[in-house]
């Protein structure tokens, strides 16, 4: 008697075991196998359960073999999901990370609070916008906000503009250090996930070090080069009392707020750990002039 062909559900279990055996965490392995299977089935991940009792799609194991080399699942399928929204990627574009969802939720809450207090169109700027992850998500969740983003990489800026279609977010290609001079002193909220990995530090996963663009990762010997630049840009852009939310490394929980406090431009600057990294919250003071 011929044995029954394995179902997709059985293949998911087997693939998850292979990925965990290759050093990928169990949670990530489960999420990745579902993303790969959904792509192979040509359905959204949320609809994958309708396929589980059926046969294994021909491309599924090809995708799994690529993932076993530590190629990110998002690069294999060409898109990523962030806070439930799909973001198309492209070669050379930074893959959004789940830990950035925490800073994004914080930003949404702050924008919603501004709207409740009577700010009709709170202005938010996303520096180093990548594929538009934060900017587009903020525009979707707080449609009353005016959302602008800037990204240096031409490939990433193109991807961000595609992802922003229909959301109201506006993405420009350019250097975040010189962002939006016409808005100096008027912005309510700045968000940024700048490069912050020190040159030579190899603690990040192969998915990051070997597949994300170097422009989005490395930031000098201490990992503070772009953070210093973003401090100056945010201080210039923000209105007094405006807030900066900045993602940084877990190893920078002390050095980043110290850097901000030393400038005298912030009435508050503190960092908290997130699931894998850190997030700085800084409030622009009313007394110190913006940087020249």
From Swiss-Prot:
InterPro entries: DNA_methylase_N6_adenine_CS, HemK-like, Methyltransf_25, N5-glutamine_MTase, PrmC_N, SAM-dependent_MTases_sf
Binding positions for S-adenosyl-L-methionine per the UniProt entry: 128-132
Annotated GO MF terms: nucleic acid binding; protein methyltransferase activity
Pathway: Antibiotic biosynthesis
Keyword Disulfide bond attached: no
Biological processes per GO annotation: biosynthetic process; methylation
Name of one Pfam family that matches: Methyltransf_25
The enzyme's E.C. designation: 2.1.1.-
Protein purpose: Involved in pristinamycin I biosynthesis. Catalyzes the SAM-dependent methylation of 4-amino-L-phenylalanine (PAPA) to 4-methylamino-L-phenylalanine (MMPAPA), and of MMPAPA to 4-dimethylamino-L-phenylalanine (DMPAPA).
UniProt enzyme class: transferase
Catalytic activity: 4-amino-L-phenylalanine + S-adenosyl-L-methionine = 4-methylamino-L-phenylalanine + S-adenosyl-L-homocysteine + H(+); 4-methylamino-L-phenylalanine + S-adenosyl-L-methionine = 4-dimethylamino-L-phenylalanine + S-adenosyl-L-homocysteine + H(+)
The name this protein goes by in its record: 4-amino-L-phenylalanine/4-methylamino-L-phenylalanine methyltransferase
Lineage: Bacteria, Bacillati, Actinomycetota, Actinomycetes, Kitasatosporales
Family note: Belongs to the protein N5-glutamine methyltransferase family.
This protein's encoding gene: papM
Record keywords, A-Z: Methyltransferase, S-adenosyl-L-methionine, Transferase
């Amino acid at each position: 008697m011929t044995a029954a062909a394995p179902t997709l559900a059985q293949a998911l279990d087997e693939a998850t075991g292979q990925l965990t055996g290759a050093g990928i965490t169990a949670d990530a392995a489960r999420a990745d196998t579902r993303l790969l299977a959904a792509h192979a089935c040509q359905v959204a991940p949320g609809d994958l359960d309708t396929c589980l009792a059926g046969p294994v799609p021909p491309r599924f194991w090809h995708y799994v073999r690529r993932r076993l080399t530590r190629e990110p699942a998002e690069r294999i399928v060409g898109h990523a999901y962030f806070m439930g929204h799909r973001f198309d990627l492209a070669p050379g574009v930074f893959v959004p990370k789940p830990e950035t969802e925490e800073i994004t939720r914080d930003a949404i809450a702050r924008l919603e609070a501004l709207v409740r207090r009577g700010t009709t169109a709170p202005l938010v700027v996303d520096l180093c916008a990548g594929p538009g992850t934060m900017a587009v998500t903020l525009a979707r969740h707080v449609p009353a906000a005016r959302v602008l983003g800037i990204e240096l990489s031409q490939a990433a800026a193109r991807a961000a503009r595609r992802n922003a279609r229909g959301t109201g977010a506006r993405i420009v290609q350019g250097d975040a250090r010189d962002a939006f001079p016409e808005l100096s002193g008027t912005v309510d909220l700045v968000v940024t996930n700048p490069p912050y990995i020190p040159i030579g530090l190899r603690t990040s996963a192969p998915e990051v070090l070997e597949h994300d663009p170097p422009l989005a990762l490395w930031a000098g010997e201490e990992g503070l080069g772009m953070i210093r630049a973003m401090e100056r840009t945010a201080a210039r852009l923000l209105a007094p009392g405006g807030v900066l939310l900045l993602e940084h490394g877990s190893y920078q929980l002390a050095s980043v707020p110290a850097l901000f406090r030393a400038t005298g431009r912030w009435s508050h600057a503190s960092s908290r750990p997130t699931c894998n990294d850190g997030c700085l919250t800084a409030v622009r003071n009313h007394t110190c002039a913006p940087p020249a």
